[in-house]
Amino acid sequence: MISLEQAKELVQLLEQGRQDDANRLFTYVYESANNPMFKEIGMLTRDLHEALKNFQIDERFSEIATDEIPDARERLHYVIQKTEVAANKTMDAVDRCMPIADKLHESLLLIRPEWNGLMNGRIELMHFKSLCHRIDDLLSQVEGDSSELRGELTEILMAQDFQDLTGQIIKRVINLVNEVEKRLVEILTVFGAAQKEQKADKATVASIEPEGPILNPHERIDAVSSQDEVDDLLSSLGF
């Protein structure tokens, strides 16, 4: 397919009577259009173009970007909040448990010497009576402190109830990330194929002088600047 610029050049050569130059230009255009590399590049361009169009109009991508990602962000914030609340409750309960445990430990240390004397048979009757009273007091203390410890441990256990709900939220976010990853891999695969094809044909393409980037597309009537124009161009080339 001859371009507008090439058609203008061909007409100009014919008007100037430069028949040989016109024939060479026509032969170049014809051979370029029937070049296998040209066809491969055209087909690859069509595939890439369609993939990009599908990427742009994919309603699922739009839904993910506008709805599910913001929703996932809010859900993760919720997980952070619930985790923070549970951590604070747990730490507060532990802080309340520590003095109780320390007090029990100190009481046991105070009674241990007399208890060792009793076990070794080296205790007087008066000390034995005193030991019995102290043990009775210790039992009462243990009874009260153990009840308090049980309450604090229950508080710690209840603070962990967030895990079931937050676990479900995290799994949902992971599924969303996996879906986004899958769709991005599909897009990258298309680009990867384009790059591989470009490298394979690099030596051949080097023999064709490139026109270079279009620096003033608004002034060029042969430049494409929209999706519809790309479609029309590819269709006119037979792809």
Curated annotation (Swiss-Prot):
Keywords: Chemotaxis, Cytoplasm, Flagellar rotation, Hydrolase, Protein phosphatase. Its EC number is 3.1.3.-. InterPro entries: Chemotax_Pase_CheZ (IPR007439), CheZ_family_phosphatases (IPR050992). One of its GO terms (cellular component) is cytoplasm. GO terms for molecular function: phosphoprotein phosphatase activity. The record marks Q168 as: Enhances dephosphorylation of CheY-P. Belongs to the CheZ family. Homodimer. This is Protein phosphatase CheZ. It comes from Vibrio cholerae serotype O1 (strain ATCC 39541 / Classical Ogawa 395 / O395).
